[in-house]
Amino acid sequence: MGTEENSSLEPQELWQQEYDKAHLRDVPFETMSGVPVDPVYGSEPYPGQYPFTRGLYPSMYRSRLWTMRMFAGFGTAEDTNLRFKELLRNGGTGLSTAFDMPTLMGRDSDSEWSLGEVGRAGVAIDTLADMEDLFADIDLSSVSTSMTINGPAATILAMYIAVAEQNEVTPNQLAGTIQNDILKEYQAQKEYIYPPRPSMRIITDMVKYTTAEMPKWHPVSISGYHIREAGSTAAQELAFTLANGFAYVEAAIAAGQNVDEFGRRLSFFFNSHSDFFEDCLLYTSPSPRDAHESRMPSSA
């Protein structure tokens, strides 16, 4: 859409052009009463256009539904592996990994600090062998994996890559997300290991690596959920989350990264609370704000 030919088109024409190129799901797009539903209603901005209030892609969920994955993890790696396979057999299209507290804090299961917490509310991962058991007989080239971990994120991602390579799956084939949002740990969840500056260095190194080697991977999931659960309002959740996101972008730019290369792989995780209209605003506000900030000279 950056050609001179496209620049002369109206927004609606641009959207229609891109929509017509999209591969749509082979299902009827209609209401339960059989009334056809148009691909878009109203005026500009259209889906897939700046500032992306109506979504990132011209065809949105008509092309592909969001990934269906249940948060899962308990006991040993073998226990969770069986659960993963059960979820995939019953319609799951991705995996979402919950780790136990010792793993989240970078501790071994046999540490005195881990007493009573091993395998509770998440799976225990101490070694590469555990990671091998966790994903045994699962084709990592065909499944998207989310891993909710922050302080030890670099170690866990390295283990995941090693397991994939043992099964002849290269890093550029891997799709998924690692939370890796350390700033919200200091603010809300408190599961951090290192001080802020070294932690930010690790994150920027991971952004650099995944941008170069793992084009299907999201290296940071910027999370407002934990901030809301710690007692914030919806507005505060949005404010802290966006501030954290801009901090990661600025740190990566300062380390020599190009925001146009890594920015599209940053994801967000917000809380779905009990106020319908507040949540509608919460989920639609970040896109135009991010789009505006990314066009500013300081972010280029």
Task: For each feature predicted by the language model, list its residue ranges.
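Hydrophobic alpha-helical segments, chiefly the membrane-spanning helices
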Residues: S294-A300
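Recognition helix of helix-turn-helix DNA-binding domains
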Residues: A291
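Conserved small/polar residues in nucleotide/adenosyl-binding loops
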Residues: Y283-P288
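Catalytic alpha/beta active-site cores
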Residues: G2-D279
